[in-house]
C-alpha cells in the first residue's frame, strides 16, 4: 500500500471541492473506529483507518495537503462497509463522505481508453441489465472451468490478486431469479417485497432463495419486483454518483408500482445501505 502523501501529481481540480469539509469536522479522533476497520486491521496503518482518511480529507480541503495520486489510492482502498459508523460516538457519516470524495475524484480523473471502456461496459451495460449480467457471469464461469482466469491480468489489465479473489460461479440451477410470488406457509402475517439485486442472483442466488423460503415459513407472502436489476450501490461506491441516483430512483419507482405500502426485505447489506 502506497503512502497517501506519495506521488506528487495533483488531480486537475480545485482541491477544496474534493471533500465534504463540514462533515469531516464531526470527527473527534477518538479512535473507536480502528478496531472495526478491515483495511486498518490488514495494514496496521493509521492512514488506512477511518480516522486517518478523515484527517487526509480535512488536510486536502484546508489545502495543507495536495490531492495526490496517493490520496486517491487511499480513498479507493476503503471498502465503504461503514462498520465504523456503528461505533462512532460523534455520528460521523463516513460513508457519505467517501462517496462524495470518490465522486469528485472520478470527475477529475484522466483514465486511459481501455479503463474508460471497461468502466462504461461494466457500469452502463452490464450491471443495469439482467441479460448483460447473465452473459458476463456465464463468460466468467466458462473461463473458470477452462482455467483461463490466470490470463486476465494480461488480457484485461487486472491485478492477479483480483482474479484470484473472484468467487466460483455457482451452477446454473442456482442462478435463477425468484418466482413472482412465494406463498406464505401457515397463517399469513402479511406481504413483503424482496430486492434481489444485480450480483446476488448470479453469484449468491441460493441466498436469495433461502431468504424467500425463510420469510414464507414465517408466514409472509414474498413478492419479487419485475424488471428490477441494479439499485446503483456499486456505482456509488465507485464514484459514478449520477447514475447511482438514476438507478436508485428507478428502483424506488418499480417497487412503488408493485405496492408502495409493503415492507422491503433484502439480504445484501450494500444495497440496503445505499437505498436507505
Enumerate the language-model features and the residues they cover.
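Iron-sulfur-cluster electron-transfer modules
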Residues: 15, 21-24, 54-228, 234-275
